[in-house]
From Swiss-Prot:
The protein, known as: Glucokinase
Organism of origin: Chromobacterium violaceum (strain ATCC 12472 / DSM 30191 / JCM 1249 / CCUG 213 / NBRC 12614 / NCIMB 9131 / NCTC 9757 / MK)
EC id: 2.7.1.2
MF-aspect GO terms: ATP binding; D-glucose binding; glucokinase activity
InterPro entries: ATPase_NBD, Bacterial_glucokinase, Glucokinase
Region (Disordered): 327-348
Gene name of this polypeptide: glk
One record GO biological process: glycolytic process
GO cellular component: cytosol
Residues that hold ATP according to the record: 14-19
HAMAP family the record matches: Glucokinase (MF_00524)
Reactions that this protein is recorded to catalyse: D-glucose + ATP = D-glucose 6-phosphate + ADP + H(+)
Signal peptide positions (record): none
Domain of life according to the entry: Bacteria
Length: 348
């Protein structure tokens, strides 16, 4: 919410995930500086994290702030599902002396940023050229599984907010049926997020151990990735392959649901760390493996987002739209990413 429109700059921006919070100052339109990443577990509340950030960067008076957050938003009270923070938006605004404090879903923020991402921060994984006036889909595994989209609206774009990561996982082969049974016995409902997340990667590895009659080594996600990428552990490598395959199926479903011929974007913190493995993985095959609709999906480009802080421009755009003296958001030009580039261009 906001009260009035005092000092316009700098503006405080945030992107809060389940594990880390990234904060920055926008000192002029599109100029984002002083980016810091803070560990959520170090701070009792969001307010404490914000105060520490402002102290570290020596920020002068800040009046307006917006934060993308990895959580559903419904009213003033926020209880984070993947973090211990629980807070009132209005109470936090007052405590920090802000005139404006907006919260939006983190993947809505990332969706708003998609048309603003430079080509050098995207790596194309298959498909053709994007259609300029078609929807854009966004999916990304991290601490959880974020899903969003941009749809054409009034000469610009409108972001869709939802909880698509919690849709039901459907296995596609016997091995995946075994994984579903393993997860279902422990959790009941098996969502895509249950498997397509950091903890999901560990769960996949444990399930494979159980299916093979091996001891369930409780490996952390980073250990599964490292052993799989190095080839030191065949079961870890299979877990990575299945992870990419399941992500391909989920991304293909999303593309069909939205008609996302403008492209499907992969965000989140996990896939960029898979280096060239992702390009050679079953992802693209499973993305297109939709029977009669396979040819439709074969033309849709997939872009891996390689930017270190991709959501912050979207947070800035949301805040700018809120503060601008007009009723409708300013149109955003359609992205025109040319065909080319590979997942080998990515960086961690």
């Amino acid at each position: 919410m906001s009260t009035g429109l005092p000092e316009a700059w700098p503006r405080l921006l945030g992107d809060v995930g389940g594990s880390n919070a990234r904060f920055a100052l926008e000192t002029a339109p599109g100029v984002i500086e002083d980016i810091l990443t803070l560990s959520n577990e170090r701070y009792p509340t969001l307010e404490d994290a914000l105060r520490d950030y402002l102290a570290q960067v020596g920020a002068r008076r800040v009046a307006h702030a917006a934060i993308g957050i990895a959580n559903p938003l419904n009213g003033d009270l926020v209880r984070m599902t993947n973090c211990h923070w629980s807070f009132s938006i209005e109470a936090t605004r007052r405590a920090l002396g802000l005139s404006t404090l907006l919260l939006l879903n983190d993947f809505t923020a990332l969706a708003l940023a998609l048309p603003r991402l430079p080509r050098r921060e995207l790596a194309q994984v298959g498909g053709g050229a994007p259609r300029p006036d078609a929807p854009l889909a966004l999916i990304g595994p991290g601490t959880g599984l974020g899903v969003s989209a941009l749809v054409p609206h009034a000469g610009g774009w409108r972001a869709l907010a939802g909880e698509g990561g919690h849709t039901s996982f459907a296995p596609a082969n016997e091995r995946e049926i075994g994984i579903w049974r393993y997860a279902s016995a422990r959790f009941g409902h098996v969502s895509h997020e249950r498997l397509l997340s950091g903890s999901g990667l560990s769960l996949l590895h444990r399930a494979l151990c159980a299916l093979d009659g091996a001891e369930e080594a409780g490996l952390a996600p980073a250990e599964v990735s490292a052993r799989g990428l190095s080839g030191a552990d065949a079961r870890c490598r299979e877990a990575l392959e299945i992870f990419c395959a399941l992500l391909g199926s989920a991304a293909g479903n999303l593309a069909l649901t939205l008609g996302a011929r403008g492209g499907v974007y992969i965000g989140g913190g996990i896939v960029p760390r898979l280096s060239g493995f992702f390009e050679q993985s079953p992802f693209r095959r499973r993305f297109e493996d939709k029977g009669r609709m396979s040819a439709y999906l074969a033309d849709i480009p997939v872009y891996l987002i390689t930017s270190a802080y991709p959501a912050l421009p979207g947070v800035a755009a949301h805040l700018a739209d809120h503060l601008a003296p007009r009723s409708d958001p300013a149109p955003v030009a359609a992205p025109t990413h040319p065909r080319g580039g590979t997942a080998g261009d990515m960086h961690a």
